[in-house]
């Protein structure tokens, strides 16, 4: 039987650290795609997504496992915080370009 995300976290918290790889396998693409919506450079997005997984593993013992808690939602929140940090490091000029550029809609510069 397949373990739930919550059960994997419980077992990782009890010392079965190798099971964290199962979460990574299940949800890596989802986390990467989430990051790619904000950071268009694939290599940078992969770095940010990878850092989210590293931080999740480092903080896993503090994650409160409940049946109504989304493990992947927690990892996406970590990724969102890292995206914010990345954008802050870029500075306001680069950030405003990324925020305002939408290739699906016309842009008007006044």
Regions flagged by a language model, labelled:
Residues 47-54, 69-81:
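Structural recognition of an alpha-helix C-terminal capping motif at a helix-to-coil junction
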Residues 8, 24, 32, 42-59:
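Conserved RNAP core-binding helix
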Residues 58-66, 76-98:
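Arg/Lys-rich amphipathic alpha helix in sigma70-family domain 2
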Residues 9-33:
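A short, charge-rich alpha-helical start-of-domain segment used by transcription regulators
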Residues 5-6, 24, 28, 53, ...:
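Hydrophobic alpha-helical core bundles mediating ligand binding, dimerization, or RNAP-core interactions
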Residues 1-2, 93-110:
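Internal acidic/polar
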Residues 6-9, 17-21, 42, 68-76:
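Short, structured helix-loop boundary elements
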């Amino acid at each position: 039987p397949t373990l739930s995300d919550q059960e994997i976290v419980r077992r990782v918290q009890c010392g079965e650290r190798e099971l964290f790889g199962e979460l990574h396998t299940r949800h890596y693409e989802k986390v990467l795609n989430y990051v790619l919506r904000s950071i268009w450079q694939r290599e940078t997005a992969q770095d940010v997504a990878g850092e989210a997984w590293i931080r999740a593993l480092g903080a896993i013992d503090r994650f409160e496992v409940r049946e109504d808690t989304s493990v992947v939602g927690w990892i996406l929140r970590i990724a969102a915080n890292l995206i914010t940090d990345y954008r802050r490091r870029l500075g306001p000029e680069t950030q405003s370009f990324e925020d305002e550029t939408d290739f699906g809609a016309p842009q008007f510069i006044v």
